Every structure is written in structure tokens, then in C-alpha cells.
Design a protein with these regions (language model features):
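Charged, low-complexity terminal tails
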Residues: 1-2, 327
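Conserved ASCE/P-loop NTPase catalytic core
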Residues: 2-215
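Conserved AAA+ ATPase small/helical "lid" subdomain
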Residues: 232-287
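Non-catalytic, well-ordered alpha-helical scaffold segments
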Residues: 21, 155, 196, 200, ...
Length: 343
């Protein structure tokens, strides 16, 4: 097996269970809307994202397609695949999901792609140079220090993540292509916050910090030393646990659409949102989707109270209004515990 310097096993990561769960849930159901990971550097954020990509199932793609279109999903084909399909069956190959990184200084053109206006005006052709959102289609889009990006760029990313389509318009010329991806943003709150309107559009949010447990800190150093000395041996030592999680994710992706969501669970989610005084209804939708994904991951056929309890904090943490010191207000953990405990 060819290994690169980023392929540290997912199951070898010590601690950070909430972060790992948030990533897995988005892999099972990308409509959750991505995850924002807040915390200091050196806490395994990028390592976990790259390790997750190795666990996800291979994809069928149209060979030669810039956007990695799925051959069996013509409604989501790009213009090139539609045109090629008129001349016969499309060639098919497989690929693994990969992590596409957004450079911190990326321009809007680099993100969305560029249209050759000269060719459009002179020849009537639509020559398009794909951007990061094209590379990200059916992959993981990793945005480090998302809080340092221009707000407009963040808006563009979140729009594409929500719609599954990237549309570029220049001088009356328009090009659209599929752009469905798992969005993972990271930030250090000490370097600046995101506007609440942008925070709300991330499906899940988790806070990570350096591990304080003595034994776990020692284990991190020991594991890293073994990994750096012989990565192939280290990976083989974790091959069984990696395969178990890989199979669990693949099964959950397949069964997720069949997981039922009882009305009483929807009422519980709504009660939590009301008690926390959360604006809008996005939190209810995300919580329902995340709880369904957790149920599928647990091989359960129906969402239960425990599934809501396990995902609620990562759904609501970034959506609860901050309250001035001494003024009181809803406490996230207390509200969730109280609501779940009454069921």
C-alpha cells in the first residue's frame, strides 16, 4: 500500500472523539452542511480530515471529467458530460475521495473558476477554467483559518455547499457545474471570529483543545514516534480497526436513507431549539439529519433520544446567542439534558 505523509490512521488518533464523530456524520450525510472545528493549532484537525478521506468508499466517476461526475446521475452531470453522452456511453472509472485545500489567499476567480470572455464573445463558446469548487465536487473541501477569509469568499463557499452547484457569471455569460462536497472549516477563535450569519450556515461545530490527560498525552507522543519511524508497520497495526470503521461508514451510507425519524423526535428537537432561543429553523433540520446519520452509524433503524443527545451540542453550540456576563440565559448543556431527560 502506498502511503504518504498525511495518511496517519483515523483510529490511531487519540481523543478528540466529538471532532471525529462530526466528520464521520458529514461523510454519511453531506447534507448536514459541513463542520466548523474551532481550536488551537496542533490538535489533530487536519490529520483527522485526511485520515477520514482514506476510510470513505471509492466513487464511480466519468473518466476524463473535470468535475468527477457520477455516471449514473445524469441530473447532476456537467455540460461536457451531457454533450459527450449524446455520442454514446460515457467511460467510467473509480477514484478515492480526496481532500481539496483552499489557499488562505485565494481570489474569487481561483475559488469559482474563470470564463474566457474573449472566446465567448468572438466564438460563442463557453471556455471555462475550473476553480477550487470544481476540484471539490464529490470530495472534501478543507478550509484552514476560515475566519481569516474575506466574508464574500466564505459566502461563496457556503452557497455552493448548500446548493450543490457553482454558477459563474461574467458580462452576461453564465456557466454552472456540480459542486457537492463535505465542507470542513477550521479556525482559532483567538485570531478573530466569524459573523453569526456565517456561523449558522455550518451544519455542525466542535471545539477542540490540547488533551490534558497525562496518559493520553504520552500515548500521542509514543504513537507519533512509531509512525515516523515506520509508517507502514504502524498502519498495519491499525489495519483491522481501520477496516472496521471503513465498513461501518460504508454500511451507514447505504442504510441512512431508510432510517426513520419519529414525530416525537422532531418535537424533541424543536423543543430544544425553542428553549435555546435559536433563530430560524436551520438548527432543527441539521439536528434531524445528524441524528439520522448517527442512528445509521449505530446500525439502528430508527432515530432515538440517545442519537439526538449525542449530536445536539455540536448542532446548537454555535447558534446559541451569547449573553452578557451576569445576565443569565439558556445554558446549552443544561437545556439539552433537561429536554432529553423528560422523554
Amino acid at each position: 500500500m502506498a502511503l504518504d505523509r498525511y495518511s496517519y490512521p483515523f483510529t490511531a488518533i487519540v481523543g478528540q472523539d466529538e471532532m471525529k464523530l462530526a466528520l464521520v456524520l458529514n461523510a454519511i450525510n453531506p447534507t448536514i452542511g459541513g463542520v466548523l472545528i474551532r481550536g488551537e493549532k496542533g490538535t489533530g484537525k487536519s490529520t483527522a480530515v485526511r485520515a477520514l478521506a482514506r476510510l470513505l468508499p471509492e466513487q464511480m466517476v466519468v473518466e476524463g471529467c473535470h468535475f468527477g461526475c457520477h455516471p449514473d446521475d445524469p441530473e447532476d452531470w456537467c455540460a461536457d458530460c451531457r454533450e459527450r453522452a449524446e455520442n454514446g456511453p460515457l467511460p467510467v472509472t473509480t477514484r478515492r475521495m480526496r481532500v481539496v485545500e483552499l489557499p488562505i489567499n485565494a481570489s474569487e476567480d481561483r475559488v469559482v473558476g474563470t470564463i474566457d470572455l474573449e472566446a465567448a464573445l468572438k466564438e460563442g463558446s463557453r471556455r471555462f477554467e475550473p476553480g477550487v469548487l470544481a476540484e471539490a465536487n464529490r470530495n472534501i473541501l478543507y478550509v484552514d483559518e476560515v475566519n481569516l477569509l474575506d466574508d464574500h469568499i466564505v459566502d461563496v463557499l457556503l452557497d455552493a455547499a448548500a446548493m450543490g452547484v457553482n454558477t459563474v457569471e461574467r458580462e452576461g455569460v453564465s456557466v454552472s457545474h456540480p459542486s457537492r462536497f463535505i465542507l470542513v472549516g477550521t479556525m482559532n477563535p483567538e485570531e478573530g471570529e466569524l459573523r453569526p450569519q456565517l456561523l449558522d450556515r455550518f451544519g455542525l461545530c466542535v471545539d477542540v483543545e490540547g488533551i490534558r490527560d497525562l496518559d493520553q498525552r504520552v500515548a500521542i507522543v509514543e504513537k507519533r514516534a512509531v509512525w515516523e519511524d515506520d509508517p507502514n508497520l504502524f498502519y498495519q497495526q491499525h489495519a483491522e480497526s481501520e477496516q472496521a470503521v471503513r465498513s461501518q461508514i460504508a454500511e451507514a451510507i447505504g442504510t441512512f436513507p431508510e432510517v426513520t425519524l419519529p414525530r416525537e423526535i422532531l418535537r424533541l428537537i424543536a423543543q430544544i431549539s425553542i428553549a435555546l432561543e435559536v433563530d430560524g429553523h436551520r438548527s432543527d433540520l441539521v439536528c434531524a439529519r445528524a441524528a439520522q446519520a448517527k442512528a445509521a452509524y449505530d446500525s439502528d433503524e430508527q432515530v432515538g433520544v440517545s442519537h439526538v443527545s449525542e449530536v445536539a451540542e455540536m448542532v446548537f453550540a454555535h447558534r446559541v446567542h451569547s449573553v452578557p456576563f451576569g445576565k443569565g440565559g439558556p445554558n446549552l448543556g443544561e437545556v439539552i439534558s433537561r429536554m432529553v431527560g423528560t422523554q
